Amino acid sequence: MIESDAAVRGHIEMLASRVFQTETKWPHFRLLLRNLIDWSNRLAPDATVVSLERTLLYGGVSLFAPLFRRQHFISVDSSPESARDRGAYNAGMIDDPRCIPVPFTRHAPMNATGLQAGVADLVTVPNLVHHVGDQQGLFAEIARLLKPGGTAYVFEPLVRELHQMPDDYLRYTPFGMAAELAKAGLEAGPFELEGGPFSAIAYCWTQALEYFPEAERSRMQQWFDDDHFPQLMQWDEKYRDNLVRDHTQFPVSFSIVARKPA
């Protein structure tokens, strides 16, 4: 059964408010949601989408499958073995009646999915490239999965703490990512940037708050939520350009697309 538009809108609202907390904590994830919604609306109903994900931390649920309900969607769970030991520690984020729980399709490493070559019109890698040790193998697998003329979509952070250690390997700039996609035989297209220096400060504050003792953290959290975060977001919208140095930007995340030659 294809979920209704209203149900999918509810799922997207749940992702924004509960999982990615775009209005209260991590505004740079707006780019990811905006891009995937756009792709789901643009792709033909008979298109095949392969999403390389980590679903075990959400109890084996694909966050993005409901968006592509009209396409053939394959969720490849690429959670490492360490994820099984950690369990579904983010499952509470999707404990919401708006969530449409679609389980992952298969479990496989990102660099060896076992899927047929040339199966995908679109391959998405949402916020996971930095968790893959075999970078060359990952990009080669993305290229292998794509049909001629197919597109790869990658979302990555630029400002991020070390997390899910030890499975956290590197950070790319959009230019570095474009170079790696080109090495795999893909034609890197345009990229988008999200956030500015003030949302970077906000992100660092969300991390720093976790280092306060619990009693002090509650007080600081209220100050951050009520006063500092709203002010930072206002500044982030108002002051977009570096007025001192040219050729300089301070985004918090980016997305990029790359096409497999026809």
Give the ranges of each region predicted by the language model:
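Conserved S-adenosyl-L-methionine
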Residues: 186-197
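A short glycine-rich, Lys/Arg-flanked "PGG" loop and its adjoining helix->strand segment in the class I
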Residues: 136-148
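A C-terminal cap/extension of S-adenosyl-L-methionine-dependent methyltransferases
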Residues: 199-262
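Class I SAM-dependent methyltransferase SAM/SAH-binding core
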Residues: 48-112
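Class I SAM-dependent methyltransferase Rossmann-like catalytic core
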Residues: 1-45
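Acceptor-substrate binding/catalytic loop of class I
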Residues: 160-180, 200
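Conserved beta-strand signature within the Rossmann-like core of class I S-adenosyl-L-methionine
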Residues: 150-156
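A conserved beta-strand element that flanks and buttresses the S-adenosyl-L-methionine
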Residues: 124
